[in-house]
Design a protein with these regions (language model features):
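Recognition helix of helix-turn-helix/homeodomain-like DNA-binding domains
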Residues: 26-41
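Short amphipathic recognition helices of helix-turn-helix/homeodomain-type DNA-binding modules
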Residues: 60-67
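Key DNA-contacting residues within the recognition helix of helix-turn-helix
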Residues: 7, 32-33, 62
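A short, Lys/Arg-rich alpha-helix, primarily the initiator
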Residues: 1-15, 23
């Protein structure tokens, strides 16, 4: 997973990490932990929520979430 690209996508859309955590209904500390572990613990449901809330294209999802 490319956490730098995910963080960039969040910021490009005008959110900070804390705001985005609220939007995807995730505890802020949990999102920070996931990002600090290179996202290796995101569930499929969480990835889908992130995709939807950031309006990521299929190519962006692949680029961010797949090695």
């Amino acid at each position: 997973m490319n956490t730098k690209k995910l963080k960039a996508a969040i910021i490009e859309r005008g959110y900070n990490i804390g705001q985005f955590a609220e939007i995807i209904e995730m505890d802020r500390s949990k999102l920070y932990r996931r990002l600090s572990r290179n996202g290796n613990t995101f569930t499929i449901a969480e990835v889908l929520a992130i995709k939807a809330k950031l309006d990521l294209s299929p190519a962006e999802v692949v680029d961010i979430f797949l090695p």
